[in-house]
UniProtKB/Swiss-Prot annotation:
Zn(2+) binds at C407, C410, C425, C431. This is DNA ligase. Keywords: DNA damage, DNA repair, DNA replication, Ligase, Magnesium, Manganese, Metal-binding, NAD, Zinc. Its cofactor is Mg(2+); Mn(2+). CDD domains: BRCT_DNA_ligase_like (cd17748), LIGANc (cd00114). The gene is ligA.
Length: 664
């Protein structure tokens, strides 16, 4: 029992401290998943030993004490937390507990909502006017943030209509959309200021400003999710209440849906999880609430949460683990990237053992050392990265990360040009790592498209000394290729034929395949369409290169110096050729000067085909939405890009409208 008592005390202390850092200081030091694990362990101990549970236990509290810098506000109706489920089995058990509580067989209709990762707030309207806003605080007492909330454009200062209760308390989440968060951090980074780790911290930090002008400058948004005071004067459906709030001018998430039973909830969860990366805002799960208000009242509450609602958490996108070592990898352009070797940890649905540290500046910014406990984040398809260090757990034998001065692959000197954050190997194609990556890029589907020449084969070709430059690919024969691992005679003959077929290409593909720094597909296309021939491009001065659309000073210099090195285009001697490019008349390029962005799933055309078709008509196809975007093409499950385009008033096309425009 003494061991259990000791662990209970330790868990209470840890959760109290972590809760204070999360709710009060807006500076969480452990991932949500770690906090949830500790809380579940505490609840399990208290279930077996109820005598250990007191009114001061973290299991019956929500958040932490409010900051003394703000006036304290007592909530008339406590703002409780939610219990969690993490699997379909736990979801079914949640539904069964409610049936057992009601002592009858019943079919539940649930109001299902995304679980926004922001800051819960209470808004009090008196006679239709916003008179007070407060944070959740510890659930009983929050902090008054009225002046800051008044700066959030999504929150009405006066309710629309006239049929609202005389006193109405609206509850919801203040959050920062992904696009706004990224733009704000980019601006801060450019100014040498502190950046926020994630949108949740950014939203909370923005609301907790004593100067409301700072809050006003932040891209905050708000979605209502419930009613406190005054709710008894509204309808008997939770979803209906949200719709009523929307009619009065309070926004609700467009993803809110009514679903039947645990099976319907699970389907909602799976759908939102699949589209998580496309949503305009961060979420860490979904919330299920019994829709019928009379049933909510009958089910009641436990100490810290309602019995009629639960949060279904997604696989954690952030986890704690140990940084065991750092290796330095060399890329196609010589960029040296520090890669963290981690104690394997399950994050975002996969096991992670590596994470990028980006560059020397990022290592310095994080203050990370080998041996540290770190927080690693994996969101969607983004490469896992370390976002924070748990300095309190740093061991005495932690080691500084020393950036090498020589290439770890070829031994050439490393250099970092003034104004750049990237350190590069100066070895060029002498460096085996650069050689391999350059050849992989050259043969890629979007470049020379050598069918069957995968990464493993390229690595063998370089390791055996058969290929030193892309030009060497065209002198390979079937006998040489048949000597490679897992390469039979037939496969070797097929690969020789594929290499031979790749000699016929287009000038834009060839320019992209060369691997000139900063020259992507769009820039390669612009260069080809401007100069029409490789000879004209090679003869161009830096000033002439600057006349090409979207080519700035840095790109112009990269192109100029690259094409003046004979070995960079010796591949031409292998007989690579392309059809002549004809100067297009203005009538043939109706989208000239227009910038398009593609988002969501396209069904009529592949993304690459749509991009190529638009570029052929003179359009620029960008990867992100900005004020310079002319048209957004929105396919199925369009998310944050669509939301930003709507916010900026940009023209939005369906895929059918795009198809019609391409055929006209």
């Amino acid at each position: 029992m003494s061991e259990t008592l000791s662990r209970h005390r330790q868990l209470c202390d840890l959760l109290t401290e972590y809760g204070h850092q999360y709710y009060v200081l807006d500076n969480p030091t452990v991932p949500d998943a770690e906090y949830d694990r500790l809380m579940r362990e505490l609840i399990a101990i208290e279930s077996e030993h109820p005598e250990l549970k007191t009114s001061a236990s973290p299991s019956v509290r929500v958040g932490g004490q409010p900051l003394t810098a703000f006036r304290q506000v007592r909530h008339e109706i406590p703002m409780l937390s939610l219990d969690n489920v993490f699997s379909s089995e736990e979801l079914q058990a949640f539904e069964q507990r409610m049936k057992d509580r009601l002592k009858r067989e019943i079919s539940f209709t649930f109001c299902c909502e995304p679980k926004l990762d922001g800051l819960a707030v209470s808004l009090l309207y008196v006679d239709g006017q916003l008179v007070q806003a407060a944070t959740r605080g510890d659930g009983a007492t929050g902090e008054e943030i009225t002046e800051n909330v008044r700066t959030i454009k999504a929150i009405p200062l006066s309710l629309r209509g006239s049929d609202w209760p005389a006193r109405l308390e609206v509850r919801g989440e203040v959050f920062m959309p992904k696009a706004g968060f990224e733009a704000m951090n980019a601006k801060a980074l450019a100014a040498g200021e502190k950046v926020f780790v994630n949108p949740r911290n950014a939203a909370a930090g923005s609301l907790r400003q004593l100067d409301s002008r700072i809050t006003a400058s932040r891209p905050l948004n708000f979605y209502a999710y419930g009613v406190g005071v005054g709710g008894d004067q509204l309808g008997d459906s939770h979803f209906g209440r949200l719709c009523q709030l929307k009619a009065w001018g309070l926004p609700m998430s467009p993803e809110v849906k009514l679903k039947e039973g645990a099976a319907g909830c699970q389907a909602f969860h799976d759908d939102i999880l699949a589209r998580r990366g496309e949503l305009a805002y961060e979420i860490d799960g979904v919330v299920y609430k019994v829709d019928a208000i009379p049933l909510q009242e009958e089910l009641g509450f436990v100490a810290r949460a309602p019995r009629w609602a639960t949060a279904h958490k997604f696989p954690a996108q952030e986890e704690m683990t140990l940084l065991e070592n750092v290796e330095f990898q060399v890329g196609r352009t010589g960029a040296v990237t520090p890669v963290a070797k981690l104690k394997p940890v399950f994050v975002g649905g996969v096991t992670i053992s590596n994470a990028t540290l980006h560059n020397a500046d990022e290592i310095e910014r994080l203050g990370v050392m080998i041996g540290d406990t770190v927080i690693v984040r994996r969101a969607g398809d983004v490469i896992p990265q370390i976002v924070a260090v748990v300095e309190a757990q740093r061991p005495v034998d932690a080691r500084e990360i020393l950036f090498p001065t020589q290439c770890p692959v070829c031994g050439s000197a490393l250099e970092r040009l003034e104004g750049e954050v990237v350190t590069r190997c100066s070895g060029g194609l002498f460096c085996e790592a650069q050689r391999k990556e350059a050849i992989k890029h050259f043969a890629a589907r979007r470049a020379m498209d050598v069918d069957g020449l995968g990464d493993k084969i390229v690595e063998q070709l370089v390791d055996k000394g058969l290929v030193k430059t892309p030009a060497d690919l065209f002198s390979l024969n079937a006998i040489q290729l048949a000597g490679l691992e897992r390469m039979g005679q037939k496969s070797a003959l097929n690969l020789v034929a594929a290499i031979d077929a790749a000699r016929s290409t287009t000038l834009p593909r060839f320019l992209f395949a060369l691997g000139i720094r900063e020259v992507g597909e769009a820039t390669a296309l612009n260069l080809a369409n401007h100069f029409l021939t490789l000879d004209a491009l090679r003869a161009a001065s830096v000033e002439q290169l600057l006349e090409v659309a979207d080519v700035g000073d840095i790109v112009a210099k990269h192109v100029y110096y690259f094409l003046r090195q004979p070995h960079n285009i010796e591949v031409l001697a292998a007989g690579i050729h392309w059809p002549a490019i004809e100067k297009k008349e203005a009538s043939e390029q109706p989208f000239a000067g227009k910038t398009f962005v593609l988002t969501g799933t396209l069904n009529l055309l592949s993304r690459n085909d749509a991009k190529a078709a638009l570029q052929a008509l003179g359009a620029k196809v960008a990867g992100s939405v900005s004020a310079k975007t002319d048209v957004l093409v929105a396919g199925e499950a369009a998310g944050s890009k669509l939301a930003k385009a709507q916010e900026l008033g940009i023209t939005i096309w369906t895929e059918e409208q795009l198809q019609a425009a391409l055929q006209s």
